[in-house]
A protein has these predicted regions:
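Active-site-proximal beta-strand elements of phosphoester/diester hydrolases
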Residues: 2-10, 119-125, 244-245
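Acidic, His/Gly-rich catalytic cores of divalent-metal-dependent hydrolytic chemistry
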Residues: 136-281
Length: 281
């Protein structure tokens, strides 16, 4: 039995198929944790979702910004953009099954091994003020709204860059928006946790006054192992307490799977090269 963490697939089903063949994946034996952005920008978003659904409990995804954008598009809150490739889902005969499955997925997952080590998985990142317990509770808040009858209203208010900083006193749509933006969009922030949404460059090109979210000096999750995707220009990171696994599949990079052992520090990287589906920019 093997456990794999897989970075952003973004609708590249052929690359996912080749990766699963490469690792000899068996849904009866292995488990895949998908770090969000399963769909969009690539050519076969509906096929990715169908494949994941077919594998049942062997696939454990979490939601990224593109997955939430699908729900917003499906509910008429946002029209698909010029570069979106969501139509294969929106026009699918099994559209409702696909959308229902997406809406059931969480925004964060946590694994704990027999030694008590914890591995937090999110799509983009976390704010420095949040402990692991905070992350899981706040992700659940959003998850509860996504699974409720209030989903359309939640989606209408989900978009926006403000507030850009967490305060425990936040309520309503502002509170939910900050949580969503941190878990699915953050790259850079100030050392105090004010999020920036303008720059998507590499960590070395951090704008003045900003740091990658994981470099915040007082980050409460610094002693927790964190795995994330979302940031293709960051490239692969494999540190004892940090794994970044978006390696730019949709842009012609690689699709990456990190195989992890029982103590989470035993790791083996598996990659397949991807055909370029879109040009960056």
């Amino acid at each position: 039995m093997s456990t794999y963490l897989i970075g952003d697939i973004q609708g590249c089903d052929s690359a996912l198929d080749r990766l699963l063949q490469h690792i000899d994946f068996s849904p009866s034996r292995d488990t895949l944790y998908l770090l969000g952005d399963l769909i969009n920008r690539g050519p076969a978003s509906a096929d990715v979702l169908r494949r994941c659904m077919e594998y049942g409990d062997a696939v454990k995804p979490l939601l990224g910004n593109h997955d939430l954008h699908l729900l917003a598009s499906a509910h008429g809150v946002r029209k698909p953009g010029r570069r979106d490739t969501l139509q294969s889902i929106l026009d699918a005969p099994d559209r409702q099954d696909l959308l229902k499955w997406v809406a059931q997925q969480p925004l964060a997952r946590c694994l704990e091994n027999p030694q008590g080590q914890q591995l937090l998985m999110v799509h983009a990142g976390v704010l420095p003020q949040w402990s692991l317990k905070d992350v899981m509770a706040l992700a659940q808040e959003v998850h509860d709204h996504i699974r409720s009858e209030g989903l359309p209203e939640f989606l209408q208010h989900m978009y926006g860059n403000t507030p850009n900083q967490w305060h425990a006193t936040l309520t309503g749509h502002d509170r939910l928006r900050v949580i969503v933006n941190a878990l699915t969009r953050i790259r850079f922030c100030t050392p105090g946790g004010a999020m920036d949404f303008e720059s998507a460059e590499s960590a070395e090109a951090a704008p003045v006054g900003l740091v990658p979210w994981f470099e915040c000096p007082d980050r409460q999750t610094r002693d927790v192992m964190v795995a994330f995707g979302h940031w293709s220009t960051l490239g692969l990171i494999n540190r004892p307490n940090l794994m970044a696994l978006d390696t730019g599949c949709v842009w012609g990079g690689c699709l990456s799977a990190m195989e992890i052992g029982h103590d989470f520090t035993e790791r083996q990287l598996h990659q397949v090269h991807c055909d370029q589906a879109q040009q960056p920019g």
